[in-house]
Swiss-Prot record:
The species this protein was found in: Burkholderia ambifaria (strain MC40-6)
PANTHER family on file: POLYRIBONUCLEOTIDE NUCLEOTIDYLTRANSFERASE, POLYRIBONUCLEOTIDE NUCLEOTIDYLTRANSFERASE 1, MITOCHONDRIAL
Gene that this sequence comes from: pnp
Domain named S1 motif: residues: 629-697
Protein name in the entry: Polyribonucleotide nucleotidyltransferase
GO cellular component, one term: cytosol
InterPro entries registered for this protein in UniProt: ExoRNase_PH_dom1, ExoRNase_PH_dom2, ExoRNase_PH_dom2_sf, KH_dom, KH_dom_type_1, KH_dom_type_1_sf, NA-bd_OB-fold, PNPase
Job description of the protein: Involved in mRNA degradation. Catalyzes the phosphorolysis of single-stranded polyribonucleotides processively in the 3'- to 5'-direction.
Residues the record lists as binding Mg(2+): 493, 499
Cofactor: Mg(2+)
Reactions mediated catalytically: RNA(n+1) + phosphate = RNA(n) + a ribonucleoside 5'-diphosphate
Domain of life: Bacteria
Amino acid sequence: MSMFNKVVKEFQWGQHKVRLETGEVARQASGAVIVDVEDTVVLATVVGAKSAKPGQDFFPLTVDYLEKTYSAGKIPGGFFRREGRPSEHETLTSRLIDRPLRPLFPEGFYNEVQVVIHVLSVNPEIPADIPALIGASAALAVSGLPFNGPVGAARVAYIDNAYVLNPTRDQLKASSLDLVVAGTERAVLMVESEADQLPEDVMLGAVVFGHEQMQTAIDAIHELVREGGKPEWDWQPAPKNEALIARVTELAHGDLLAAYQLRDKQARSTKLKEVYAATSAKLEEDAQAAGTVAADKATVGNVLFDIEAKIVRSQILNGEPRIDGRDTRTVRPIEIRTGVLPRTHGSALFTRGETQALVVATLGTKGDEQIIDALEGEYRERFMLHYNMPPFATGETGRVGSPKRREIGHGRLAKRALVKCLPSADEFGYSIRVVSEITESNGSSSMASVCGGCLALMDAGVPMKAHVAGIAMGLILEGNKFAVLTDILGDEDHLGDMDFKVAGTEQGVTALQMDIKIQGITKEIMQVALAQAKEGRMHILGKMTSAVSGANTQLSEFAPRMITIKINPEKIRDVIGKGGSVIRALTEETGTTIDISDDGVVTIASTSSEGMAEAKKRIENITVEIEVGQVYEGTVLKLLDFGAIVNLLPGKDGLLHISEIVNERVKDINDYLKEGQQVKVKVIQTDEKGRVRLSAKALLNEAAASQSDTPPQQ
């Protein structure tokens, strides 16, 4: 009899067969599930602490998605030959898994939970992110932790006007949509997508299609839990302190109401801090008078936050003005300025209300492309977008350093929004880096990065296919009443039930990201929200088009210029030289950057047109074919007993035999030639090994013959 209580469930899912198993591996974890999708195998584990730490006032969930290089049959690079810090892809996938799981833990559950997913085997055609999300959901479901799942997930492509479930990587290349959707049996919780200017109804259809198809995975997880699940935890939320809630409401409700009449963010934040401090102080006085212990600040803070949420939500649902005085459909005032930084290649300052992004575009060469060593193989990225949000953007102090998960995620969202509207590499040969520096933030800074990024690219002279704008939307739902909010503030993001970001052109959507915190948001509500988002996007596009009608026709004087020439691929090694000596000398002496592709396309880039012209001339000289009959003015490099080595072109030498110098017999070559002497020679022979024979006397004989043919003058 086996020592393992192994449970396996298999199901057909689109074009793939999926296998879930639990009970054999990682048995000391709270829950562990292995997911196998056509040889892409992940191990998802969950460990939950049995109790919360004293004073804990938030839910400490961590999700780590880790790719092992052995899964692709590789050994890691680097000195230590082992996996190091998470890659950007691992960080983004960790966020992708975290987002639909987090809202399904019950309110008041503050026990630490850690989800770790290891990628153990990779089929290059099957991305591991969807199996990882399914595995994390299944591991939580079998663990018995208080979790209102399970969660299903699906990737949806759109090929030839049809939706495709969980496409392969090759299918994704032909698709105009890459959408990941996750949710429960009843509701969608998360959407992440990149699209090629698709209409809203196609995007919504993809979400609905994905939600329908993921039910197969959810059913399989239910079956796995029935046979291999652990007993459910006997966890109950701490009973609400009704007396404390009543007292805090009595002390603070009026002041909180007054605070939310202040339209300026800084003034409102100051007032709210005063209310929090005054309420805590008053409660401490009450406790001292009664001889009891006052409630801790975290508990009081949670009660105050709930009161804030009720105030803001009820005002909006009752049709009253929002926090900053707007109605539900109005976009904040927009100011646009381009060319703000004198020596950058392109720059824009995009301000929407109290959110501001300073965005800079830099043009580079092929050598500046990012080389990514992924499990499925190495590839290059010609377009990079990096998002930075320092603490001063919200008037706070904090750590400044390497980007956090949030910054990496926001940067990727902005990149998704812009990438489909960039010119192809054939149309515009530059590599491109965009950096968004958030200088002020009060909601929707990632969408400000999209708008500012588009404007900075146009300022840099990048011929964009269309203007791209982004807008962040919110939603508040109470029973049958709901309100969709255009261009949400930071506070509305925290207090709402859904936030979603839509970016696109006049023609359609290029990126859509949704995070839904509650169940019960229907297709009809999402339809209304997307229509209202389109209205807001069109308004912003109008402002952007008025400010910048199109890309600059001239590149910045500080941006590199490029010329491209084609050489015989067999001559590439001559241009590079032994150990790179020739190309290194070329770049240093001409001040250029030179990239050579395997098919012989040479790209020369420099801010100096003279340097580019010189580099081009020298490369043409190196790669020119030496043909019989051509005449060159060469330099004597070396004298030998039987002749001289003459340099014709850089890297091209020939032999001038002693018998080919003059017509008479030469006893001592030194009587006729010196090293460094310029000599005119004709190519009389070449062979398959590239050896060249030269003649000087042939030119003398030709000159004599032409003179004898000339009739005497009268």
